[in-house]
Each structure stands twice: as structure tokens, then as C-alpha cells.
Regions:
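Active-site beta->alpha loop and helix N-cap motifs at the rims of alpha/beta catalytic domains
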Residues: 2-9, 13-144
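Catalytic alpha/beta core domains of metabolic enzymes, predominantly
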Residues: 126-127, 140-183
Length: 183
């Protein structure tokens, strides 16, 4: 089983009108994706509403997904938030649940330098023993991780993949040309 090939679905987190998670529907969505052949489930990313959930709810959603998937396909769990210390705490808590990897977004709202991004991601990567997928989504975070930053981070043993939601083919090609198959 690998998280690095095929189709990984960023799954939605369904809610009831009162704001509570609809776990029955969530379970049905997971089963549908597995039955239709998806290769991995990404839980509590942007599509999964992670930025709107308190930590305990996010952890519960991830825990439910891991148990529902039951090892049939990889589960990549969103654990990045807008500050480093919080991201580390959340990543460590989620690591205990047993996901196959963590999806860590660039900090949102707080714009930092590329060196600040390096320090942020390295601190998180140093705090866990799980593969980390870098998530570059400037439309949601307000900042772009530069190709050179991604290259630098690709040298870390725990940083193994990159999710590109930049929406600029020139940037994507620059990352590919610079980083190659390192992630």
C-alpha cells in the first residue's frame, strides 16, 4: 500500500444543520470512495472543513475515518493550522490515531517569509514519525511556498510528498523541474 500513486480523494466532512458531524453519511462517503477504487482518503483538509472544526472534533473525524477505512487504503490526515506550536500539538495527537501520513498546510492568515515556512514545516516534521505531505494552497492561506522552499524541505526524511493547489502551471512546472522525484 502506498500513498504516493493513484487518486487520493479529499473527502468532505458532512454536517447536520445544528453543526454536528453526520457520521453515518461520512461513513457512507468513505465506503463509496473505497468501492469506486480511490487509492487514498484525505481527511480534514480544506475540503473536509478542518479550519472550521475545534481540535477535538477534527481528531474525532480523523479517528472515525481511520477506523472506518480499517487499513484498506491509506488515510492522510490534515493536521496543519496557522501556528507552529498548535500544528505540532495537533499532529502529535493525530499521530496516535494511526494515519498513514499527515497533510500540513502552509500557515494561513499569518504571512511569513520562506525561511519562516521552512522553520515551521521542519519543526512539525521533527515532532512526529509520520510521512508529511506539504500542502500549498495560496487561495486559502494567502501565501505561496516557493519552489526553492519545497526543494529545501524535500531533504527532510519525513517530508515525502507535495499537494499543489497553487493554480499556476508555471509554478507547478518549476517545482517539478527543481524538486524532481524527491517528493
Amino acid at each position: 500500500m502506498t500513498i504516493y500513486t493513484g487518486s487520493g480523494v479529499a473527502i468532505v466532512t458532512p454536517f447536520f444543520e445544528d453543526g454536528s458531524v453526520d457520521y453515518n453519511t461520512f461513513g457512507e462517503l468513505i465506503e463509496f470512495q473505497i468501492a469506486e477504487g480511490t487509492d487514498a482518503i484525505i481527511v480534514a483538509g480544506t475540503t473536509g472543513e478542518s479550519s472550521t472544526m475545534p481540535d477535538d472534533e477534527q481528531v474525532a473525524v480523523i479517528d472515525f475515518a481511520i477506523k472506518k477505512v480499517a487499513g484498506r487504503i491509506p488515510v492522510i490526515a490534515g493536521s496543519g493550522v496557522n501556528d507552529t506550536a498548535h500544528s505540532i500539538r495537533l499532529s502529535k495527537e493525530i499521530e496516535k490515531l494511526g494515519p498513514d501520513a499527515l497533510l500540513v498546510v502552509t500557515p494561513y492568515y499569518i504571512k511569513t517569509s520562506q525561511q519562516g515556512l521552512i522553520e515551521h514545516f521542519e519543526a512539525i516534521a521533527n515532532s512526529v514519525d509520520l510521512p508529511i505531505v506539504l500542502y500549498n494552497v495560496p487561495g486559502r492561506t494567502g501565501q505561496v511556498m516557493a519552489p526553492e522552499t519545497i526543494l529545501h524541505l524535500s531533504q527532510h526524511k519525513n517530508i515525502v510528498a507535495y499537494k499543489d493547489a497553487v493554480g499556476d502551471i508555471a509554478h507547478t512546472l518549476a517545482v517539478r523541474n527543481l524538486v524532481g522525484d524527491k517528493i
